Curated annotation (Swiss-Prot):
Pfam families: TsaD. Its EC number is 2.3.1.234. Signal peptide: none annotated. Belongs to the KAE1 / TsaD family. GO terms for cellular component: cytoplasm. This is tRNA N6-adenosine threonylcarbamoyltransferase. Keywords: Acyltransferase, Cytoplasm, Iron, Metal-binding, Transferase, tRNA processing. It catalyses: L-threonylcarbamoyladenylate + adenosine(37) in tRNA = N(6)-L-threonylcarbamoyladenosine(37) in tRNA + AMP + H(+). It is an enzyme of class 2 (transferase). It comes from Xylella fastidiosa (strain Temecula1 / ATCC 700964). Binds 1 Fe(2+) ion per subunit. It is found in: Cytoplasm.
Length: 348
């Protein structure tokens, strides 16, 4: 099956073609992403109405571009997958509307995909994918969750953030230190030059049982340290390093605890913060020390993209699942409520 995937949940427009007749990374025939960062920069964050309108402008040209890169005509598609939630309702409706219309015109099945299931499965697009069962850390600007994956489509929430997501905390700390939007990646780049231990911040909630997270108190601690400093460039990089170390340590401690809880040695990390170099190195070292393995998607597939949607959709379409003809989206959607897969035969 040749499946086209459409992602439009927030401020990236993503389109990809996944071919189940191929294996490994070769199965991803093409993928394209258009980012709206420049559009939202002057507002310091995503403006939902502007995001929706930009998806309308960019989605069809991106579809044509991706099909051309895959060397396919639209008539050769066997199915359509699209992000149905969670996300911004207007942005989701743009992608869902285009996907449903395309599927109807081609007389092929369509499937609405859970955005976070797409992220969770994205490491399976690589040449040496992890095998189930595994523990997944989903870490992005909107989510920080630990999920036990007993089988593809069978998910148990182990813990989640009680307030700010890790990526959200990165962006907010960057903003309070005067970095332009989106500040998270710039903060991480500054942290690489900082001196370890110059600023030591709390590792929140690691001293109590459980697998939930909280980053709002850490954010306040960083704010106070920054306000009480001379706010020089040298201090900025050291504060950035102290903050990043605190977040990475917290995530690593909770991940190790989750692996122990479910008696598993494989950790999958996905979501935008999964591209962070410090986090990758820390989790890889932790898993190696345990005799286990940490698996990540390539950095280009950590942020929102159509490839993960095409792949997740292919799994469910091959299992015989599909969505009805109505254009429906679910801005808030519990991944544990997803139907299990009847078949696990989709080739990777």
């Amino acid at each position: 099956m040749k499946i086209i995937g459409i992602e439009s949940s927030c401020d990236e427009t993503g389109v990809a073609v996944y071919d189940t007749a191929l294996s490994g990374s070769a199965a991803l025939r093409a993928h394209s992403v258009y980012s709206q960062v420049a559009l939202h920069a002057e507002y310091g964050g995503v403006v939902p109405e502007l995001a929706s309108r930009d998806h309308v402008r960019k989605l069809l040209p991106l579809l044509r571009q991706t099909l051309a890169e895959a060397k396919l005509s639209v008539e050769e598609l066997d199915g359509v997958a699209y992000t149905a939630g969670p996300g911004l309702v207007g942005a989701l409706l743009v992608g869902a509307g285009v996907a449903r219309a395309l599927a109807w015109a081609l007389e092929v099945p369509a499937i609405g995909v859970h955005h976070m299931e797409g992220h969770l499965l994205s490491p399976l697009l690589e040449d040496d994918p992890p095998e189930v069962p595994f523990v997944a850390l989903l870490v992005s600007g909107g989510h920080t969750q630990l999920v036990a994956v007993d089988a593809i489509g069978d998910y148990r929430l182990l813990g989640e953030t009680l307030d700010d997501a890790a990526g959200e905390a990165f962006d907010k700390v960057a903003k309070l230190m005067g970095l332009p939007y989106p500040g998270g990646p710039q903060l991480a780049a500054l942290a690489e030059r900082g001196i370890p231990g110059r600023f030591c911040f709390t590792r929140p909630m690691v001293d109590r049982p459980g697998l939930d997270f909280s980053f709002s108190g850490l954010k306040t601690q960083v704010l106070l340290a920054w306000r009480n400093s001379d706010q020089s460039d040298a201090i900025r990089v050291d504060v950035a390093r102290g903050f990043e170390d605190a977040v990475v340590d917290t995530l690593a401690i909770k991940c190790e605890r989750a692996l122990d809880t479910v008696a598993c040695q494989t950790l999958v990390v996905a979501g935008g913060v999964g591209a962070n170099k410090c986090l990758r190195a820390r989790l890889q070292a932790m898993c190696r020390q345990r005799g286990g393995r940490a698996c990540f998607p390539r950095p280009a597939l950590c942020t929102d993209n159509g490839a993960m949607i095409a792949f997740a959709g292919a799994l469910r379409l091959q299992a015989g699942q599909q969505s009805d003809v109505a254009v429906r989206v679910t801005p808030r959607w519990d991944m544990a409520a997803l139907p299990p897969l009847v078949s696990r035969s989709c080739r990777r």
